[in-house]
UniProtKB/Swiss-Prot annotation:
GO terms for molecular function: hydrolase activity. Pfam families: Lactamase_B_2 (PF12706). NCBIfam families: PRK00685.1. SUPFAM superfamilies: Metallo-hydrolase/oxidoreductase (SSF56281). This is UPF0173 metal-dependent hydrolase Rcas_3617. It comes from the Bacteria. PANTHER family: UPF0173 METAL-DEPENDENT HYDROLASE MJ1163 (PTHR43546:SF3), UPF0173 METAL-DEPENDENT HYDROLASE MJ1163-RELATED (PTHR43546). Keywords: Hydrolase.
Length: 244
């Protein structure tokens, strides 16, 4: 497996959830689907609680990205970062305002030593709360700048958009997390074109293989990158695996 070499450890917990240990030793989670996640290893279900979290970044409101957020908010005392609509809902559920950082696309905040800029994605964002469909604002991604200057971009659940070229031009991310599963998000061909626009050194595919309907594979992504002439190292993690 390739190494990143940026004093950052990235662990895939399956589907769209990632655990990141930053160069400064902070522990962050991107999206919060752990307990009900059928591919998240039991070890990680325990570790995110026992080791604690400094911050949780939420991309949107679908159950497979926030189902465990209230439990993890209680268990870890993490600062929760997301679109203002999501953090307002969390406040209504009893999460303290001092632990919520709500903002919107184009905005930048600093949490746990990380400078995070919220970016555009194209998807949808609702949550079913006690049988009621609750709007959760709009879907988003994040550009994350680590303490040592390492830049990562998590696209969120999305189709390919030309905005990705702007993100590549402005922030020059070295590593991109992006979905490849098809049906609800990009397929491998669209994801490869997204990488052509962004031009990172590394790509970590996600949001595939959780259910049979999410058919895209990392090998298909590599094939499409080759077809588009994209020079990128695709890091193919299995749920529970890490790369540094």
């Amino acid at each position: 497996m390739a190494t990143i070499g940026r004093d950052t450890t990235i662990s895939w917990l399956g589907h769209g959830t990632f655990h990141i240990q930053t160069p400064g030793g902070k522990k962050i989670l991107i999206d919060a689907w752990v307990d009900g996640n059928p591919v998240c290893p039991d070890e990680w279900k325990q570790r995110v609680r026992s080791e604690g979290l400094d911050a949780i970044f939420l991309t949107h409101g679908h159950f497979d990205h926030i189902a465990d957020i209230l439990d993890l908010a209680t268990a870890t005392n993490a600062t929760i970062v997301g679109q203002f609509d999501i953090t307002s809902w969390l406040a209504s559920k009893g999460v303290g305002q001092d632990r919520l950082v709500g903002f919107n696309k184009g905005g930048t905040v600093e949490v746990a030593g990380i400078r995070a800029t919220m970016t555009h994605a194209t998807h949808s964002s609702t949550f079913t709360d006690n049988g009621i469909i609750v709007p959760m604002g709009t879907e988003a991604g994040y550009v994350l700048r680590m303490e040592n200057g390492f830049v990562m971009y998590h696209t969120g659940d999305t189709a390919v958009t030309m905005d990705m070229q702007i993100i590549g031009d402005l922030y020059r991310p070295e590593l991109v997390f992006l979905p490849i599963g098809d049906h609800f998000t990009m397929d491998p061909m669209q994801a490869a074109y997204a990488l052509k626009l962004i031009r990172p050194k590394f790509a970590i595919p996600e949001h595939y293989g959780t259910f049979p309907i999410l058919r895209g594979t990392p090998d298909q992504l590599r094939e499409q990158c080759s077809a588009f002439g994209v020079d990128v190292t695709v890091i193919d993690l299995k749920p529970g695996e890490s790369v540094s």
